[in-house]
Amino acid sequence: MSTAEPAEARIEDADTIMVAPSALRDHDVVRDFFGSVITPEDFASGATDLARKTVYLCGDLSGSGTGGRRLDAAARVFVVRELSHGYDEDAGGRWDLIGLGRVPLRVHGVGVYYRRFFEPGADHFGRISAEHAFQSLTESDKPATAHRSGIYLTPVTRHGDELHFRLLRCSTNLSGPTEDFGPTDTRIVEALNREAATVFRNHAPLNHVLAQIYHNTLATEGRKQSKAKISAHADKTKDMPAHGIMAFCTFYDRLDGLRPLAEDAFDFGVKGASGLTRLHFRLKEPSAQHDGGAPPAQFTLTLHPGSVFLMPLSTNRLYTHAIRPSPLDAESLPTRLGYVVRCLSAEAVHKNGRTFLKTAGDPAPLEQPTPAGMDELRRLYAEENRTSSFIDYGDRFPFSMNTGDYLAPAVHDLG
């Protein structure tokens, strides 16, 4: 481990404002809003600086008290459909109309959650599945194939016979190569980067995806059902910059067997029981401190369709996270596509049939792992699961556990 603590991305809400009447102050979206909340009267006073800020409008928008030209100084203005009235979008409205799920919610100061950042009707599950051939995978030193399929995705550029891309050399071993972004990936990651710019300071851009389809196996005679899950772990940051961030996106297939729950319109289930997957966080060290305070020992997010959870790597340093299935039977569950977007600093070039790591000097060939190297890397991986300290991987590991990293990345050539 390194005793030096590199600068991390920080969550910053100073540029996000909600205008909401006092009557809405107990609404969960207003109460948990990521940013400052002011009343229409405060807003009308002109005391709030709107320059380059994101503004969410609620309440009566029919009068002149909604800001007029003052809102032109804002970077973005959203009208929250369910919490507003009097806004006539068809009459040349210049602000974007959004649903409750698109409003950012604060999660204990360690992340920001959007319950429906992407509209389920856009069928991201189908689009992503059509643009890529998902691969079988194993984890770390486990010989069995996991109950999910996946693929690494990142922009791939061709320079003559060379293919340039980014590597995530973690313990997930895929049967095929990294693939270039498809059109849907590009749109998703561009939207996430735009949003991240309003949530974080000093952060690296999102540029890499691990997409995984979580398969549930029905019970048969002589075989128990199996529901997709992943045990508690921290992401391995060997190929990530310290100021990186992460975006957990969720898309579902086969939601038609579930219905919206009365107590949460974004949740889907049967007879009051949720059929959706949960993302559970637990502190690695109970005494950990964050921004001078004590973060919660644990918390859980329901992964709603089209949801996004944004967090800095400091949250990954403090917490492990686990994927937990619904208590419903496997036959009732939808199929989930977990679409995790990260920031990678490791760059590579594939040429002459080999993958090379880009370094300060000449590119270095990606070597085959040695038993000693694998043992040391696994030791550090286990340590990153246990400690909230920074893990310094250095440049001691010129190999990958993922056999796909030794293959030429697949490129979406145009024409």
Language-model-detected regions and their locations in the chain:
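Non-heme Fe(II) oxygenase metal-center motifs and adjacent flexible, charged/small-residue loops
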Residues: 2-415
